[in-house]
């Protein structure tokens, strides 16, 4: 289990948001107590908290390959097979972790990489040249990934409390989301969150 988060915006220099980024990272500590990392530029920040299981030395995140930076949480069951396909296509690997496999799978197949991956995951890939973000979850939706899109702000995180740290997000309960909790018990409709301005990337969605 790991924790990921990120912010994209053009109206604020994120390099000047050190306190906010530290708070967001700290809020994910329960999902990744072993290590923390970040990628930061004026308009984008990716955060990662790691529970180190595979390749503790080589699997630090966010991980970069060319123009792409990934923050990843998950487990790929067919890592060896996907890695073999990529090696056959000319890719080489510096680590034994599945993060590098997912990153290079996206580099090779873009969104089509999801058809190759068998596992449970939530990840986001930021293209530093184009300034775009690709985020996705597994088919079952085991790994959580929530997001906020408000004005010129887009942010995502493994946990709702992480997004509630954003000054633009007020901790106001969404009445329809709360009604679902009361009617369905602990369940809720896929893609919904309990707080206003927040939503969840649906299972098998990008």
Give short role names for the model-derived ranges:
Residues 1-203:
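Cysteine-centered catalytic environments shared across enzyme families
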